[in-house]
A protein has these predicted regions:
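Membrane-interface extramembranous regions
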Residues: 1-131
Length: 131
């Protein structure tokens, strides 16, 4: 029961993170376009697609038959977003309003987020009765 509450809290946090982020991909896509590495084509389309996947994953975390799949999808998406974080860290001059230390902190935050996604999307363990 105690573990269930923490998992639910983690799922709420992850859902909020991706719902807000996903909506912002459509409401204000420009910042997301700006952080994309130049070697990735179709920046705006990628922003819209990733926003849609963020929204779908956030919703999927609350649908039990889809929870595991949604978790894997959000983990992959978060890992792919790391490409933008690497680009930002390698080119801090392109992002003068963001302190360099904050660009670096994004990497452990991404790792923690991936772990949270994994943990909150795993099935609950049920007690088994031995005969």
């Amino acid at each position: 029961m105690y573990n269930h509450r923490w998992k639910t809290a983690a799922r709420i946090f992850v859902t909020a993170w991706f719902l807000i982020g996903g909506v912002m991909h459509f409401v204000n896509p420009e910042p997301f376009v700006r952080i994309m590495p130049p070697y990735i084509p179709f920046h705006l389309a990628c922003v819209y697609i990733s926003g849609a996947f963020e929204l779908a994953g956030a919703i999927g975390l609350w649908i039990k038959p889809l929870r595991n799949l949604a978790g894997y999808g959000l983990m992959v998406l978060t890992a792919v977003v790391t490409l933008a974080n690497i680009h930002m860290y390698q080119h801090p001059d392109l992002f003068p309003n963001i302190p360099e230390w904050l660009l670096l902190v994004r990497f452990p935050v991404q790792a923690i987020l991936i772990w949270l996604i994994w943990w909150c999307s795993r099935p609950e363990k049920t007690a088994t009765v031995k005969p």
